[in-house]
Regions:
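A membrane-topology feature that recognizes alpha-helical transmembrane segments
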Residues: 1-177
Length: 177
């Protein structure tokens, strides 16, 4: 678990560094971290499938009254494993539909993060990025208004806006002694 978390933080810090320096993340950085992410995701999906098999076995072996009182649907573990990929897939769709107003690299970052993180951490990452991005946009807009410049075509790197969430995730994964 710690190994996959460390891999994700290395990936995130590399993306932040490249995004700050050149406003883009090289595709090779994304590709280097996809395979380990798929391995982590595969192990999570394997655990979810095992939980489904166990639940199915319990439902089959129990009496009908006990089987109907199951708390969670059979597909719940699989849905829980797949759900963290949704923000990245939506970001890639928005990137495509908006002709990359939202960068392709940002969507890839969220999709690859979904391979490593659970849904709660993904939501924190996404909401942090949106909130900090809003604050940066507001500051840029006010700065442009004060100096009489149009800020209509100004863009800024979004991945560094996720840094507060990355810090929170790091502190939750690696508690201080």
């Amino acid at each position: 678990m710690y190994c996959s978390t460390c891999l994700f933080f290395i990936y995130a810090l590399l993306c932040i560094a490249y995004d700050l320096r050149s406003h883009s993340v090289p595709l090779i950085v994304h590709l280097l971290f996809v395979l380990p992410g798929l391995i982590v995701f595969g192990s999570q999906l394997h655990g979810a499938l095992q939980a489904c098999v166990l639940t199915t076995h319990q439902v089959i072996s129990d009496t009908p009254a006990e089987a109907s009182s199951a708390a969670l649907p059979l597909w719940h573990p699989i849905w829980t494993a797949l759900l963290p990929l949704l923000p990245g897939l939506l970001a890639l769709l928005i990137s495509r539909l908006s002709r990359e107003a939202l960068g392709l690299g940002d969507g890839l970052f969220l999709l690859i993060a979904g391979l490593y993180l659970q849904m709660r951490s993904m939501l924190l990452l996404l909401l942090s990025g949106i909130l900090v991005g809003f604050l940066v946009s507001a500051v840029l807009l006010i700065h442009g208004h004060i100096h009489g410049r149009s800020m209509r075509k100004v863009c800024f790197p979004w991945i560094p806006c996720t840094l507060p969430a990355l810090c929170a995730i790091a502190f939750s994964q690696f508690p201080l002694l």
